[in-house]
Amino acid sequence: MTNRTSLNGRCPVPFLQEDLFPPTGGFIGGRYCQPVGDISCCLPCPIVSWTYGDGLFGKASSASWISVAILPLCIFLLVSYAVLPVKFTHRHYLSVCFTLGICFMEASKIAFIIPLGVKPDQCYNQITPNDMHSSLSCAFTGSLLLLGGWMVVVWSFLRTVAFHLQVCWEVILGPKFMWGALIFGWVVPAVGLTVMLILTGVSFRFGTVCHINIDGALQDYWIPIISFAVAALILQLATMAYCIHVYVKSLFDTDSTTNSSGLPSYSASVRTVSARQAYRRIRRVLQLQWRGVTLVLIIIANVIFFSVTFIELDSSLKPTAENMEKALPWVACLAATNGDREKCDPEAAKFRPSEGLLLAVLVLLSLVGFWNFILFARPSIFHGWVDFFQNKFGTGDGRLEFVSADARTRLGDTRSYEMLNSTGLPSYKSPSPMVRSPSPARMGGTKSPENGHFGRDARYVRPSMSFSSPRPPSAPQGRGWDPKTTFAPAVYREYDD
């Protein structure tokens, strides 16, 4: 319950009279006001605390702390890609950029963590929320959130295109595709973010992270994001359908067993061989890229779910005549109870998205980095770090890889180490090695002057427990076989003529 103050003016409690506040500063479009007679009455800021209650902020903070725990996993992958050799990480520019996008995506990492330490003020005054122009924290967190969404969706689309080209069209991805993907994957999110910030902007709407404003959000952000996500999903499903088609074709195609003779024929089915080769090639590609395919499907499903949820939230909270008519019983309840939110919560639940759905979006946003770590943190990465630290501190085999076996003989008197010469013993010369190189006379008799091969016949020494002896070749010199009888006869079919 709220007490009356001078800012209520002629409006019933808990509403505040709009003309008692300055017309500039903060996000004016974020005010929730409705004309009542000759005045305009507004709900206090933040609006979410009235529609969902103060408990939503505590639950949203739990999702933020999940991101705090998952952020080191994302950083661990990026550091591994940068430090370890590729034989341990199997890094690829698609995976690296994808991981960078996930670190930014929907504030699941940095954008949720920064507000935990800063604790920005969500409201510019009692009825106006802060936006990117009045709050630096709002501009930073909102930009990271929306840039992460752009990057993840665009790189999901590029990974799907690469997978489709490799599987369905047998295209070998070279430098042209790499540079094209890098340009497309970074320029499109940058342009999309710039256009969105200029035309729409971000402001505090719920929680400590700024989200895109309602006006213009659909055409400036959600429609392009959903378009890329749906295109990636359709392309991914088409690729998987092609894989299933090739697999079924290789199972049920029996043309290779229709010949009556057991001998191979020149007229074997080329179509059967091609189908089986295509299946083996696709299987190899799937074995290499199943992690990326799985993560792309998870990301696309989450992005579509997020988009639908936020669009529903925008449509329900947008101050339109239809929404005001739906919210009229709730507004009347607040005026009758002097702003008792608990008593009016059943009326608010009739027009707002469910609280569980909104919290599910925040938790899923935080878990995206966890799925990325589970799928891309190969066991070889941990072996690579063990090898890295062993070589770093001199306990691994890599430190002795280029040490010569006779390095000790290059030194003089090794007893000088640790002051062993202080005993006064005379130094003795090390004995010369007993192994000597073959003499030129011996080497001259073992090589042929024509071609340098060994020309002397080796004398056969039969072992004591052997019952075999050298035998001359049994086959006569010259060709004793007819090549015509060793090849399979040609088989002719009626449709070959």
Swiss-Prot record:
Sequence intervals crossing the membrane: 66-86, 98-118, 138-158, 179-199, 221-241, 293-313, 357-377
Query: Keywords assigned by UniProt?
Result: Cell membrane, Glycoprotein, Membrane, Transmembrane, Transmembrane helix
Q: Which residues are glycosylated?
A: N3, N259, N421
Enumerate the subcellular locations listed in this protein's record, separating them with semicolons: Cell membrane
Q: Does the keyword Repeat apply?
A: no
Any one cellular-component term (Gene Ontology): plasma membrane
- List each coiled-coil range: none
Matches recorded under InterPro entries? GPCR_GPR1/git3-like (IPR053247)
Q: Does the keyword Cell cycle apply?
A: no
Reported function: G protein-coupled receptor that plays a role in conidiation and regulation of the biosynthesis of secondary metabolites such as dihydroxynaphthalene (DHN)-melanin, via interaction with the G-protein complex alpha subunit gpaA.
Q: Which family is this sequence assigned to?
A: Belongs to the G-protein coupled receptor GPR1/git3 family.
Q: What is this protein called?
A: G protein-coupled receptor gprM
- Gene symbol? gprM
